[in-house]
């Protein structure tokens, strides 16, 4: 990768990739997905095996979907957030795994690399994405440091003109597939202690001294199309491969992760719409007791919840399009990013479970979109921050802000908070009380769920002001009011029960039955 070639590559890409309207761009992608998933092959059968046949990715990548994450000066579409979300939504209607593949490439590689990478290496990297259909990913998680990522043990030392990285990474999506990686590591001092800050480096696995050894491929429960595994890191990287943070490496990581979390609704959008469409079709066609399922009140309730999830996700996509651009520093926006990611992934899993319940036994198969959807959507509640942890962090952030504002009444605080100022009036009776700011951890999670849904309601009301379908808005408002009421009831119920040591003493039920 020589800096001297950067300008010529950039100009070449720009001339070759004149931007077509985004709607036309998406239609090209839809046509390719139709060909590979429904004409040349059957996605329900493809989903039974790990990976994807080469022709599938070859055809899909031929329309350069990843160009949405590449700056215009390098031949891409400019990294526009609305387009990134639109791409994810279009792909997830057909395949959640394909959408996540796009999301990994864009949100976890192209966007942070474009923002923090050194200029002299950008052109050749972006050129390989556009012309050679390269892929990229991110490695943060380690076998002993998942949620505790700040204490990662992957280290680096500087020697001459190179950085030497050593360590283990696992559960990075596209393990063994990606050509490029962003690797996270902590600098090792001369005393062999690791610095507190975290740095990120570009790694080109095709270059000498930069190969990453895959020690094991995992048998992941869902998302069969995406390889995961455990990686051994021992690479020598040029100084130009170090990403340059605006302040600290930790803040760079938070900006990266918060922007990624704000893009989860893109993956949720097409997925939830597909679940809704499948449910509507099945319920209108399936006859039970002389009438269609669609006519049963309980079924209507389930379908209305799916429509509410569709509306909430739409609101989140509109919100992220306006707030999560690459020009914005999101490192301090954890409250909103955590709420968006955790709530939408809960709704994704609930949507899949609901459709399986409606369809019945036929959906309990990997080659059924809803059955597959339950296992494919489940890890979204775990990766990039387990939802329980994110909900707890939301509450911790809330408590800090309330202490700073010297306000103990939850309603009064939320009324003056920009993420909740509209929604709080719809749930005043539920949140108008003085909050004990010494909240036990189990209650932190419950309160985080409540605040996450109040924030979601605020985004729905913002979407309403833009002219979105009023009936769907009203349905989602009612759904969120019910959810918040239910969660508040759980929060108010006092339960301090703990695990009983020696639970198996005098507990065999057979001893308490005669005969």
Where do the language-model regions lie?
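Glycine-rich phosphate/cofactor-binding loops in nucleotide/flavin-utilizing enzymes
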Residues: 2-3, 7, 361-430, 437-440, ...
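A short core secondary-structure module
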Residues: 168-212
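Generic structural signal for well-ordered, non-transmembrane alpha-helical segments
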Residues: 270-273, 277, 301-311, 338, ...
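FAD-binding core of FAD-dependent oxidoreductases
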Residues: 95-111, 129-145, 168-182, 219, ...
